[in-house]
Amino acid sequence: MRFLEILGILVCSLDSVTGRVLPKPRDVPGVLTELVTMKQQWDKGAANTSYVLSGDSTTANGTVPNSGGWGNGFCASLSPGTPCINRAKNGATTASFRTDGSWNMTIESARQEVANGRKTWVTVQFGHNDMKVMTPEAMGVNLMKFVDEIRGVGAEAILITSLTRRNFNSDNATLDDTLGPWANETILISEQKQTHLIDLHKWSVWYVEKIGPDAAHRLNRLPDDNTHLNANGTTVFGRMVADLMLLGLSPDIGPILPNISLSSKIWTGKAVY
């Protein structure tokens, strides 16, 4: 049985702990094995593709040692020399990101990459801080404006749902998911604006529940910090974002390099670290 088929069976099986039916096999990035053959195509496109990342601390570059968001790990998955500009900012909401000038820097980066002749992808992932100060609907209004302005400079928008927190319920099997409404709003806006979507929230919840609290907390920046990532966490979830892009957007997404060893562990629900 091929690796692709094994992944489909494993991820679609009934979860024995939670009793929930997991997503359909076609959602599973088992196709990565076959995407390896496209490596030459990605390499050729490297000079003509760029990425600009926006969001909060779960995407941002780390400001202290052994920390960072998934953006670090995602940029590391690209062919060498591919521009990957991380404009995400710690503590940001969809409102503060605009008022403090971070959004202007994001758009200007995208504008320059487009002017340089590159196909430019701009990722947008918020929710962790928005949930503290605004409704999902208010965040959605801000996301719609972001998408319009990304398109206005000739770039492609990718909305990404919030990376899960790693707070487990008392059963030590399921997560206390407080981000769901904001993730659902992101999905709704992607449908309304007919733009690209990466459902990182769904798949990070699935993965964290599969590996359990002990392994999940080994990805924490600090022992009791279930939101922010250490260097290992950035590698795992950066790879997850890369794989989801390959699954949902390939071959248009550009020079993302496969990592079958790491992906195999992630998509069979095994702890990497």
Set out the residue ranges of the language-model regions.
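Extracytoplasmic/secreted cell-surface and envelope-processing proteins
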Residues: 61-63, 94-97, 130-136, 160, ...
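Surface-exposed amphipathic alpha-helices with a cationic face
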Residues: 144-154
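Structural recognition of the beta-strand scaffold that forms the well-ordered cores
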Residues: 50-55, 59-60, 82-88, 119-126, ...
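Fungal secretory targeting signals
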Residues: 1-23
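Oxyanion-hole/transition-state-stabilizing segment in secreted/luminal serine hydrolases
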Residues: 100-141, 165
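Serine-esterase "nucleophile elbow" of acetyl-processing enzymes
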Residues: 20-90, 107-115
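Catalytic His-Asp segment of secreted/periplasmic serine-dependent ester chemistry enzymes
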Residues: 164-273
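Charged helix-capping and loop-helix junction motifs
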Residues: 137-145, 178-183
